[in-house]
């Protein structure tokens, strides 16, 4: 159980929902392997509860939750469930292998949701709250109940549902700001009043879950904690539906840096925050904005002359936390073609990467190839290199070579060689620009109906020899996959990113077909 006790009344449970709410962000779909990798990382950095997915949503979600439940050593593994019996039973089956499992069941309670979404009367909703929590409690003694759209729910009805949920066996009560509508003072008052009004409120841990539609997710989360909540639901980088969720790195560091005003503690190893941000960014192919608090590239950068002067005299003049506390290495060490395997492995360990022997060897080979083309290799280059290796290990379609003829006189022409399931294929195509020519080559070599939804380029580091990092999102048949790739040649990076997204679509389709066949055979 992850509930608080009188001896640790100021401890805040960190409930990470990157793999569930975070993945619901359009285009943020992760592969099975990426989910396992992120879950292991979250467990290792001290997250208390990992919401691993929504088991009833798909066979893929069920499989991921089930496997994470088997592998997780320390954290509670949680699955999300609607209030129906089928949902709850499926969720219970998914988390069954966990050392500590939790069922998180939810039901809308606001007038607008009950009328238009559920099309149910309040009394029927109330009865379903009781029956759903009771059913979940029959499977596990760790049950969380959420009042969806809690901040727009009528107060008396909310209190009635909360009291009934606790009486039915809920050990955690979550009152989410589902649509990001609340302001801090309002959210504080809501938690304070609910806890004072509900007679059995001391029998459960209260939880906050805030969305960022008005940019107040972190502020609202802190307000809820000050009012007595002791669990924060959040995501790495703040990813999530619409404008996202409260960012884990921000709520954790707010408690650490301003402990004088927020006298609470948590178990997160903050030195892993920057690495975690990069891992999730790579898996979702969502770049972290440069000025993102805590983990953005500019979070500890100072360009103003006045600021730089102050920093040189005393870092405390313009920095409220040490970069090292969030895992930012303050070093000017760069690597190049003369760097050996030992130095490379040391650098990987310093950056928080734990790779198997064959993965290290593969990464080192690609590092040396990059070093032959680029004078200085920075940490950002190595991060991009590792990211590419992690997602390309099982690719069915691989880029072997690419040459492009471009200039002021068109048309532009690309010649590409691919390995498709072990078969080498070559094609030459023209296009309205070099990128179009490259993508037309891929379409000729691997015919598909996927639609290009996103094409984005930015430089990994500074300088004319900087690697270009390209993000590509493809969608087909209701599936949407995003991939990133980096290379000193923008066109090569573009081809790799497109192929990365295409490989993800192929793998997703294969997994769905296999699961469908297995389900049909079992029925």
Curated annotation (Swiss-Prot):
Q: Where in the cell is it found?
A: Cytoplasm
* GO molecular function per UniProt: 2-isopropylmalate synthase activity; acetyl-CoA C-acetyltransferase activity; manganese ion binding
Any idea where the Pyruvate carboxyltransferase domain is?
Answer: 12-274
Which residues are noted in the entry as Mn(2+)-binding? 21, 209, 211, 245
Enzyme Commission code: 2.3.3.13
What SMART domains does the record point to?
A: LeuA_dimer
User: What is an example of a Pfam family matching this protein?
Assistant: HMGL-like
Tell me what reaction this enzyme catalyses.
3-methyl-2-oxobutanoate + acetyl-CoA + H2O = (2S)-2-isopropylmalate + CoA + H(+)
Q: Which UniProt keywords apply?
A: Amino-acid biosynthesis, Branched-chain amino acid biosynthesis, Cytoplasm, Leucine biosynthesis, Manganese, Metal-binding, Transferase
Report the Gene3D superfamilies cross-referenced here.
Answer: 1.10.238.260, 3.30.160.270, Aldolase class I
Q: Provide the function of this protein.
A: Catalyzes the condensation of the acetyl group of acetyl-CoA with 3-methyl-2-oxobutanoate (2-ketoisovalerate) to form 3-carboxy-3-hydroxy-4-methylpentanoate (2-isopropylmalate).
Q: What is this protein called?
A: 2-isopropylmalate synthase
- Tell me the organism: Bradyrhizobium sp. (strain BTAi1 / ATCC BAA-1182)
């Amino acid at each position: 159980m992850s509930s608080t006790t009188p001896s640790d009344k100021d401890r805040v449970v960190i409930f990470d929902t990157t793999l569930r709410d975070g993945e619901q962000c359009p285009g943020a779909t992760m592969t099975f392997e990426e989910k396992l990798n992120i879950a292991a990382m979250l467990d290792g950095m001290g997250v208390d509860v990992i919401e691993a997915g929504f088991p009833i949503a798909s066979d893929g979600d069920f499989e991921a939750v089930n496997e994470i439940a088997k592998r997780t050593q320390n954290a509670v593994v949680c699955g999300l469930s609607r209030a129906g019996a089928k949902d709850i039973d499926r969720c219970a089956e998914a988390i069954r292998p966990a050392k500590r499992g939790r069922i998180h069941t939810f039901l809308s309670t606001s007038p607008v949701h009950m009328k238009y979404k559920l099309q149910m009367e309040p009394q029927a909703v109330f009865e379903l709250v009781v029956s759903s929590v009771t059913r979940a409690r029959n499977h596990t003694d760790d049950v969380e109940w959420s009042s969806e759209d809690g901040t727009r729910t009528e107060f008396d009805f909310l209190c009635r549902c909360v009291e009934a949920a606790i009486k039915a066996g809920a050990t955690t009560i979550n009152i989410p700001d589902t649509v990001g509508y609340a302001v801090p003072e309002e959210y504080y008052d809501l938690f304070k009043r609910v806890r004072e009004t509900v007679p059995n409120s001391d029998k459960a841990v209260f939880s906050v879950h805030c969305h960022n539609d008005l940019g107040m997710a972190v502020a609202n989360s802190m307000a809820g904690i000050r009012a007595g909540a002791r669990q924060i639901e959040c995501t790495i980088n703040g990813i999530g539906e619409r404008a996202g969720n409260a960012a884990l790195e921000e709520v954790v560091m707010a408690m650490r840096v301003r402990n004088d005003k927020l006298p609470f503690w948590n178990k997160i190893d903050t030195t892993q925050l920057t690495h975690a941000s990069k891992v999730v960014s790579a898996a979702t192919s969502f770049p972290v904005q440069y000025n993102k608090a805590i983990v953005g590239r500019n979070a500890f950068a100072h360009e103003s002359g006045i600021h730089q002067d102050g920093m040189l005299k005393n870092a405390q003049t313009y920095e409220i936390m040490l970069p090292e506390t969030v895992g930012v290495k303050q070093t000017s060490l760069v690597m190049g073609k003369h760097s050996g395997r030992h130095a490379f492995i040391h650098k990987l360990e310093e950056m928080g990467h734990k790779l198997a022997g064959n993965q290290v060897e593969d990464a080192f080979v690609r590092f040396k190839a990059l070093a032959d083309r680029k004078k200085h290799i920075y940490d950002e280059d190595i991060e991009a290199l590792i990211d590419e290796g992690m997602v390309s290990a099982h690719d069915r379609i691989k880029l072997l070579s690419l040459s492009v003829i471009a200039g002021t006189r068109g048309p532009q022409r690309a010649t590409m060689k691919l390995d498709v399931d072990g078969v080498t294929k070559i094609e030459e195509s023209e296009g309205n620009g070099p990128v179009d020519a490259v993508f037309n080559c891929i379409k000729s070599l691997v015919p598909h109906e996927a639609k290009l939804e996103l094409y984005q380029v930015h430089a990994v580091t500074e300088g004319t020899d900087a690697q270009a990092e390209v993000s590509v999102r493809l969608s087909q048949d209701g599936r949407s996959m995003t991939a990133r790739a980096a290379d000193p040649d923008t066109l090569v990076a573009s081809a790799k990113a497109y192929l990365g997204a295409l490989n993800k679509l192929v793998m997703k389709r294969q997994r769905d077909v296999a699961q469908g066949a297995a389900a049909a055979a079992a029925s």
